[in-house]
């Protein structure tokens, strides 16, 4: 198992980042790849969780140990796999997640992709009281000026599709943001907040 990786961030895609260390490039699945935009070609430290499957060895990466801890708690719930947990972590609203779990807010939990009523109930059952204090806000929240526009919105929509959101939902999101100028990271964060409001 790996705890973290320190290396040069060499590539960002809608689903993952690539970190090079000792001549090897590691594909790391992350909640919001575009939150790493300012770190391209720089030394980064990414906290890791490794999933070994019959057909693949997957790495899931996080900005902070708190973010990783939330992910690990989520995958301990029956019915939640790493991809679904990553989509939940991507919302970047751990306080809302913790409140929903502690207050048995099944409706809120069902807004996450691939979370049905049974899984939401299981989350409440398994995780109520497990979050001693709400984790720090995750991700890189620095505001930045970046060339934006439709390309950035396209990248954000692609990343949201990779997280499991439906194209029909994202069509409304695209229409909402059309004509605005943000970074892909900002579009993703704003879109996730809108998707959670329903």
From Swiss-Prot:
It comes from the Bacteria. The keyword Transit peptide does not apply. GO terms for biological process: DNA recombination; DNA repair. It is found in: Cytoplasm. GO terms for molecular function: ATP binding; four-way junction DNA binding; four-way junction helicase activity. Residues 148-198 are annotated as: Domain III. CDD domains: UBA_RuvA_C. Residues 64-142 are annotated as: Domain II. Disulfide bonds: none annotated. Keywords: Cytoplasm, DNA damage, DNA recombination, DNA repair, DNA-binding. Belongs to the RuvA family. The RuvA-RuvB-RuvC complex processes Holliday junction (HJ) DNA during genetic recombination and DNA repair, while the RuvA-RuvB complex plays an important role in the rescue of blocked DNA replication forks via replication fork reversal (RFR). RuvA specifically binds to HJ cruciform DNA, conferring on it an open structure. The RuvB hexamer acts as an ATP-dependent pump, pulling dsDNA into and through the RuvAB complex. HJ branch migration allows RuvC to scan DNA until it finds its consensus sequence, where it cleaves and resolves the cruciform DNA. Has three domains with a flexible linker between the domains II and III and assumes an 'L' shape. Domain III is highly mobile and contacts RuvB. Homotetramer. Forms an RuvA(8)-RuvB(12)-Holliday junction (HJ) complex. HJ DNA is sandwiched between 2 RuvA tetramers; dsDNA enters through RuvA and exits via RuvB. An RuvB hexamer assembles on each DNA strand where it exits the tetramer. Each RuvB hexamer is contacted by two RuvA subunits (via domain III) on 2 adjacent RuvB subunits; this complex drives branch migration. In the full resolvosome a probable DNA-RuvA(4)-RuvB(12)-RuvC(2) complex forms which resolves the HJ. HAMAP family: DNA_HJ_migration_RuvA (MF_00031). This is Holliday junction branch migration complex subunit RuvA. The lineage of its organism: Bacteria, Bacillati, Bacillota, Bacilli, Lactobacillales. The gene is ruvA.
């Amino acid at each position: 198992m790996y705890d973290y990786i320190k290396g040069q961030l060499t590539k960002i895609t809608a689903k993952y980042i690539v970190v090079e260390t000792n001549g090897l490039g590691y594909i790391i699945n992350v909640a919001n790849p575009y939150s790493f935009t300012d770190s391209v070609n720089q030394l980064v430290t990414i906290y890791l969780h490794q999933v070994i499957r019959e057909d693949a060895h997957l790495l899931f990466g996080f900005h902070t140990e708190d973010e990783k801890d939330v992910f690990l708690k989520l995958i301990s719930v029956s019915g939640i796999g790493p991809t679904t947990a990553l989509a939940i972590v991507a919302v970047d609203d751990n306080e809302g997640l913790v409140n929903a779990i502690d207050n048995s807010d099944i409706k809120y939990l069902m807004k996450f992709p691939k979370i049905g009523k049974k899984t939401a109930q299981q989350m409440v059952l398994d995780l109520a009281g497990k979050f001693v204090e709400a984790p720090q806000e995750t991700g890189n929240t620095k505001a930045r000026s970046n060339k934006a526009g439709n390309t950035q919105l396209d990248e954000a929509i692609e990343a949201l599709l990779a997280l499991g959101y439906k194209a029909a939902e994202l069509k409304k999101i695209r229409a909402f943001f059309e004509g605005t100028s943000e970074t892909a990271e900002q579009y993703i964060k704003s879109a996730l907040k809108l998707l959670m409001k329903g």
